[in-house]
Design a protein with these regions (language model features):
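N-terminal active-site beta-alpha-beta segment that forms phosphate/nucleotide-binding
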Residues: 1-79
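Conserved phosphate- and dinucleotide-binding cores of soluble alpha/beta proteins
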Residues: 44-152
Length: 152
């Protein structure tokens, strides 16, 4: 239908990080015929990520942070992503997010369309997280208890 995303972006969780795994989401999206993009740390522009296409047969290797990423793949324009699954160590009901502190997701999400959702345990929802001017707000937090839409 017209409400189904045509292209999703999902992180590949860093082993031992406590991030919620995205494997089941990726497999279900692939089986539904939805295109999938995953992030790759850019080796040309420090502090930036780019997106590449992914399917279940895509070979992965750990990057310098230990995060699995494809060796290669079709470059995907971030402006084409309909739904972003963003990693979070914590989030507030305001839509503020705590990541790993390097700003990679804030940079790639800045100005990008698409619905931005974090996957995290309910216990990692916080009352308040201060926002910096460069921080990008989430549109939703998805926990084992349900979906939380931020208040503004």
């Amino acid at each position: 239908t017209d409400r189904c995303p045509r292209l999703i972006q999902a992180y590949l969780e860093q082993p031992g990080s406590g991030e919620i795994g995205t494997g089941p989401i990726l497999r279900a999206a692939f089986e539904a015929g939805i295109r999938i993009a995953v992030p790759v740390v850019d080796t040309v522009e420090p502090g930036r990520m780019r997106l590449v296409g992914w399917d279940p047969d895509t070979p992965l290797r750990p990057n310098r942070f230990g995060i699995p990423e494809p060796d290669s793949g079709e470059d995907i324009d971030r402006m084409d992503v309909d739904l972003w699954f963003v990693p979070a160590l914590g989030a507030a009901r305001s839509g503020a997010r705590i990541g790993h502190g390097a700003g990679y997701y804030d940079r790639i999400l800045a100005g990008a369309p698409g619905f931005k959702a974090a996957l995290l345990p309910q216990a990692c929802l916080l009352d308040h997280i201060p926002l910096e001017p460069h921080d990008v707000r989430l549109d939703a937090m998805v926990t084992e208890s349900g979906v939380i839409l931020p208040y503004l």
